[in-house]
């Protein structure tokens, strides 16, 4: 959970670039299951993988002095609660530079219009709360359900500093892509939880022996520091000092520095209450995002793709920079305080049921907007349709209208009544949708999405809207060859499709 490109003497400084909120053109439903791990390595994927490994050049490790390490530890790991002035600074930060992704969701939806969304998620601090014991950083069942729904419709990946095996056990979703060890261990989806995921890339494999040796040395060296914990993340090591008294930070930094003198192949970076030891190669979360996008067929020149990356730490800045360099994509920083970042938007963890409610609500809305936009577009198309009156008069709307209107005079009145009824039903459904969005227990489930039919919002060409008076509030959007049913419950949405 660190930024590989930031060396210790400069670790308190990062590039301050105001976030950009692209106003480009909602997104096509393209599930991760549609892009298998094997297909990633086909059609040029294997060649790209080989090229990536061949060009991961080692970089000289910079040995920071212990005083700089301690200053960096203090700078990025504040131990005092935020004052009112800090809160005011955060408000100004969100208003001027990095607006809330939830408050700006209309802009987010506009940026995703007509594009394929690819979702990248950090784990600690984003999907799970930050806890004292890293082995207890469990994500909530509600968050897991939201991520599962996202993965059903968009290619989705967990990009983390954790070991892949560890984060897979936490998340429990085999259909995701996983980039562990800060992107140095990338694996593709599997068909079930028992099956091993397919290894796609491990650019630091040759460093495994030295990492294991350094791990044993750090375990021995730091055992005299109460609260210190060394975690082996396979291709990197983490020295957690969250439970270490601040007075002991300097001795701990000296211990870590002493171990690294014997391993010039490794370098030291740091994140939130953790020191990271990683191979001295040019690889980070940003490179992992580039690899996954390339392997999925989304080259840099593809303008119909919108990568969305949500993370909370320095290490995620590498991914934010990649998205800004591409000129497309949304970086979203999860933070309770103002900080320099390359992210476009921000999310604050509100003190609600979940510590990570901000990310939970956002990924849920990411799905909900697909369906609400479909309804809105269908309504517009229906109103503009020349056949709208005929459809309203001739289609059984479960309101006792079995056939076409015969009397022109009474027909106008009946159509007016029907139109008002349609408006009332639509407003009631939108009110339910709003209640769903405001509920922290919102759940989304998709049943047989589109049966293989592309769910592109732009492809929905409705000639009529039929609103029933059924308790569940059924909306049927009549298209040329399919009928899409959207059922709205107080805390659940379901979209199904069947051929006409």
From Swiss-Prot:
UniProt catalytic activity: alpha,alpha-trehalose 6-phosphate + H2O = alpha,alpha-trehalose + phosphate
Gene3D superfamilies on file: HAD superfamily/HAD-like, Trehalose-6-phosphate phosphatase related protein, domain 2
EC numbers on record: 3.1.3.12
Regions that span the bilayer: none
Reported function: Removes the phosphate from trehalose 6-phosphate to produce free trehalose. Trehalose accumulation in plant may improve abiotic stress tolerance.
Protein name: Probable trehalose-phosphate phosphatase 8
GO biological process, one term: trehalose biosynthetic process
GO molecular function: trehalose-phosphatase activity
Cofactors: a divalent metal cation
Keyword annotations: Hydrolase, Stress response
Pathway: Glycan biosynthesis; trehalose biosynthesis
Keyword NAD among UniProt keywords: no
Family indicated by similarity: Belongs to the trehalose phosphatase family.
CDD domains, per the entry: HAD_TPP (cd01627)
Superkingdom as given in the UniProt entry: Eukaryota
């Amino acid at each position: 959970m660190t930024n590989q490109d930031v060396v210790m003497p400069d670790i308190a400084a990062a590039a301050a670039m105001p976030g950009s909120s692209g106003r480009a053109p909602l997104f096509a439903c393209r599930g991760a299951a549609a892009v298998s791990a094997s297909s990633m390595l086909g059609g040029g994927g294997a060649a790209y993988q080989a090229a990536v490994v061949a060009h991961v050049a080692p970089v000289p490790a910079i040995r920071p002095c212990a005083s700089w390490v301690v200053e960096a530890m203090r700078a990025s790991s504040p131990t005092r609660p935020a004052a009112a002035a800090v809160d005011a600074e955060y408000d100004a930060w969100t208003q001027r530079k990095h607006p809330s992704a939830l408050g700006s969701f209309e802009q987010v939806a506009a940026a995703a219009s007509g594009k394929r969304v690819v979702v990248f998620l950090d784990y600690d601090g984003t999907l799970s709360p930050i806890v004292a014991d890293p082995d207890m950083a469990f994500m909530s069942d509600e968050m897991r359900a939201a991520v599962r729904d996202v993965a059903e419709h968009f290619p989705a990946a967990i990009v983390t500093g954790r070991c892949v095996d560890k984060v897979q056990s936490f998340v429990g979703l085999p259909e995701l892509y996983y980039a562990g060890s800060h992107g140095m261990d990338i694996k593709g989806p599997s068909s079930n939880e028992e099956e091993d995921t397919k290894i796609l890339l491990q650019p630091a494999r040759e460093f495994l022996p030295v990492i294991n040796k350094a791990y044993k040395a750090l375990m021995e060296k730091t055992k005299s520091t109460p609260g210190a914990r060394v975690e082996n993340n396979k291709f990197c090591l983490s020295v957690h000092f969250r439970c270490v008294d601040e007075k002991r930070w300097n001795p701990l930094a000296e211990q870590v520095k002493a171990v690294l003198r014997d391993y010039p192949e490794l370098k030291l970076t740091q994140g939130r209450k953790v020191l990271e030891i990683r191979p001295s190669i040019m690889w980070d979360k940003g490179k992992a995002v580039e690899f996954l996008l390339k392997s999925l067929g989304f080259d840099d020149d593809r303008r119909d793709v919108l990568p969305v990356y949500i993370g909370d730490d320095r290490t995620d800045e590498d991914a934010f920079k990649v998205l800004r360099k591409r000129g497309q994509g949304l970086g979203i920083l999860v933070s309770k305080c103002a900080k320099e970042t390359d992210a476009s938007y921000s999310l604050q963890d509100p003190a609600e049921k979940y510590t990570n409610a901000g990310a939970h609500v956002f990924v849920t809305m990411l799905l909900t907007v697909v369906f609400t936009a479909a309804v809105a577009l269908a309504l517009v198309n229906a109103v503009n349709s020349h056949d709208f009156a005929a459809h309203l008069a001739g289609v059984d709307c479960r309101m006792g209208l079995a056939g076409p209107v015969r009397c022109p005079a009474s027909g106008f009145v009946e159509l007016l009544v029907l139109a008002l009824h349609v408006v009332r039903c639509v407003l009631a459904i939108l009110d339910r949708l709003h209640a769903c969005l405001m509920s922290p227990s919102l759940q989304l489930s998709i049943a047989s999405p589109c049966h293989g039919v592309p769910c592109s919002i732009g492809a929905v060409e409705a000639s009529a809207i039929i609103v029933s008076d059924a308790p569940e509030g059924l909306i049927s959007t009549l298209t040329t060859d399919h009928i899409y049913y959207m059922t709205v419950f107080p805390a659940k949405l379901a979209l199904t499709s069947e051929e006409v």
